[in-house]
């Protein structure tokens, strides 16, 4: 029973960290990344489709993303979707493909991005603490129901805290890595 509580908690904590990593992939650094365009939906013959389902995305240079639609009629809707995305990117269309050139980030913008990264990391830590609280509540309930002894409960709580500390350290590590990436000129 204790192992079930701890393994369930561990799975939830891992998912929280993975969610933070995915969120960080969408953050614009000075470098081009196709994950910037993950949330863009294109009007494809009356249906909203993810951009990567109607075109091939490539990164030929460090600050350039090329979008090659599978159907040339899709260039205008793709361009429109990018303009409406609030990413601050200006698509350049040559009739066959769309080029997105990412402007270099200003120092001020980099600092704003880092502040947002820190807020996201703090939110992830709050989620981890909530998961820890739920696990400890489950352990206390098991002890109250006499399913486990008080000693087992205390040992399990210490294990829960150790897992929480290691996951918080992982969040800090992910934040530090992304912060370096953003501040790199």
From Swiss-Prot:
Q: What biological process terms from GO does the record include?
A: cytoplasmic translational termination
- Grouped into one coarse class, the protein's main location is cytoplasm
One GO MF term, please? ribosomal large subunit binding
Q: Which subcellular locations apply to this protein?
A: Cytoplasm
Transmembrane residue ranges: none
- Cellular component terms (Gene Ontology): cytosol
Q: Which Pfam families match?
A: RRF
| InterPro entries, sorted | Ribosome_recyc_fac (IPR002661), Ribosome_recyc_fac_dom (IPR023584), RRF_sf (IPR036191)
Q: State the source organism's domain of life.
A: Bacteria
SUPFAM superfamilies associated with the record: Ribosome recycling factor, RRF (SSF55194)
Which keywords, in A-to-Z order, does the entry hold? Cytoplasm, Protein biosynthesis
Q: Which NCBIfam families match?
A: frr
Q: What role is this protein assigned?
A: Responsible for the release of ribosomes from messenger RNA at the termination of protein biosynthesis. May increase the efficiency of translation by recycling ribosomes from one round of translation to another.
Recorded family membership: Belongs to the RRF family.
* Record's protein name: Ribosome-recycling factor
Q: What is the originating organism of this protein?
A: Citrifermentans bemidjiense (strain ATCC BAA-1014 / DSM 16622 / JCM 12645 / Bem) (Geobacter bemidjiensis)
